[in-house]
Regions:
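Membrane-interface helical sensory segment of bacterial ECF anti-sigma factor regulators
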Residues: 1-47
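Amphipathic alpha-helical interaction segments
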Residues: 9, 90, 163-166
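Intrinsic disorder/low-complexity segments
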Residues: 4-13, 32, 48, 68-69, ...
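A short, solvent-exposed beta-edge/loop patch
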Residues: 123-203
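Short, solvent-exposed recognition patches
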Residues: 37-160
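Intrinsically disordered, low-complexity regions
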Residues: 27-30, 36-39, 48, 54, ...
Length: 203
């Protein structure tokens, strides 16, 4: 990873009005959690977008101890993402988020008002409640490839304290139930864990 000039794609107004313009169809897919809560995934369309972040971005991989402390009861491999102002030393870098994997699912967490994502979701908003936390979720199906196969991608965004979380799980369309339910379990576990404790996190 190293220090690189930042160019991340973002969700438009991450976590607030993420899905706009009514481009979703009426299709929904529901995951029922073991506590009875439901996550409603609404069929969507997607579009890419990118934005430059002022300053320089540097990253480093979380240690096993850090990952276990930040994400208890989950198997996580992730990098911490820092912004370094060109006018200050690297020792004054600012933590702005995390990017990595929980099990096979992608996770991107913004710990400031800077959104770090490589997907922009366009559609119509519908939120669910998981243990009192609002979750906005959707899914989309890819075009058929040369042999007629399609993939499905389920995703969701929600707040944990001051952090905004985006999670995404993908797989073959024929395995959509497993893809959906695996992501729903991860969402529930993240919400059960509560806000990230960054008080002892070292750059």
């Amino acid at each position: 990873w190293g220090a690189i000039a930042a160019c991340f794609a973002v969700i438009a107004v991450l976590g607030v009005g993420v899905f706009q313009n009514g481009l979703f169809g009426n299709k929904t897919d529901i995951a029922t959690l073991d506590n009875g809560n439901e996550i409603i995934f609404v069929k969507s369309e997607t579009a890419g977008s990118s934005i430059d972040i002022d300053g320089t971005i540097t990253t480093r991989q979380l240690t096993e101890t850090e990952a276990a402390s930040l994400f208890p009861n989950l198997t996580v491999t992730a990098h911490a993402v820092f912004r370094v102002d060109d006018t200050v030393s690297d020792s004054n870098k600012e933590l702005i988020g995390f990017e990595g994997k929980i099990e096979n699912a992608k996770v991107v967490i913004s710990t400031t008002d800077i959104a770090l994502l490589d997907t922009k979701i366009v559609g119509s908003e519908e939120s669910s409640e998981v243990n009192g936390t609002s979750v906005t979720a959707g899914y989309f199906v890819t075009d058929r490839n040369s042999v007629g196969e399609q993939n499905v991608i389920y995703y969701a965004t929600f707040k944990l304290g001051d952090s905004t979380v985006y999670v995404e799980n993908a797989g073959a369309k024929t395995e959509s139930e497993s893809v959906k339910n695996d992501l729903a379990t991860i969402i529930q576990e993240l919400i059960n864990n509560g806000a990230l404790d960054l008080s002892s996190f070292n750059g």
